[in-house]
Design a protein with these regions (language model features):
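Juxtacatalytic substrate-recognition/specificity segment
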Residues: 37-41, 65-68
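Short alpha-helix carrying the canonical HExxH Zn2+-binding catalytic motif
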Residues: 79-96
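Surface-exposed acidic, glycine-flexible loop patches that form ligand/cofactor-binding
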Residues: 29
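Metalloprotease/metallohydrolase-associated module, dominated by Zn2+-dependent proteases
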Residues: 2-3, 14, 18-26, 46-81, ...
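Propeptide-to-catalytic entry region of secreted or membrane-anchored zinc metalloproteases
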Residues: 1-19, 32-33, 37-40
Length: 189
């Protein structure tokens, strides 16, 4: 954990950011995201010299870095039903990349569920980008990585509505992560 624009990293920051990774990997075998050995924490949005834009978070697999805006991270967990959660979003990117990077944690996500996810993702991105009414916000249509990250935000924050709107995708993510938020939260379907 590396401070950027914050005085120091608190235990609360370490625990909560780590918990966001555990939330996604809880149903999987032990995953430590070993490729990502640096987590940079900014207090708020930060400027990227690479994109020439302000960002709230990002995952850079080449550099092994996860970057978090602390304010946006906290805001994401303050409202658990708006499907905007920076912690879930950035950790979704991290597990997506970690699964593809050849290391001791390579290919921990089930191949059958991943193949199904790829097909559903392609279908749904077309719907989003042709302005068809969609359960997900438009940003999910940017690419397969953003689709996955946005899908996991909805999976954990609006599971009942998600299952109703996109049952095949919900069931695929349930298999992929080996967990079901509806059962976990004991929600009515």
């Amino acid at each position: 954990f590396i401070p950027r624009g914050v005085d120091h990293i608190t235990d609360e920051m370490r625990v909560l950011i780590s918990a966001s990774a555990i939330q996604l990997t809880f149903g999987l075998r032990k995953i430590f995201l070993t490729h990502f050995d640096k987590i940079l924490i900014y207090m708020d949005a930060y400027y990227s010299n690479i994109t020439q834009k302000y960002h709230l978070g990002e995952v850079n697999p080449r550099a092994g870095i996860i970057i978090i805006s602390w304010k946006s991270f906290i805001d994401g967990y303050a409202n658990l039903s708006d499907s905007l959660n920076l912690g879930i979003h950035e950790m979704a990117h991290a597990i997506h990349f970690e699964n593809k990077i050849r290391n001791e944690e390579y290919e921990f996500l089930g191949k059958d569920a991943l193949l199904r996810l790829e097909k559903i993702t392609a279908r749904e991105i077309v719907k989003i980008n042709t302005k068809q009414e969609h359960f997900f916000r438009p940003y999910a249509g940017a690419n397969e990585y953003e689709f996955f990250a946005v899908a996991l935000e909805y999976f954990f924050e609006k599971p009942t509505e998600f299952k109703s709107a996109l049952p095949d995708l919900y069931d695929t993510l349930k298999k992929l992560l080996n967990q079901d938020p509806i059962s976990l939260y004991k929600l009515a379907v």
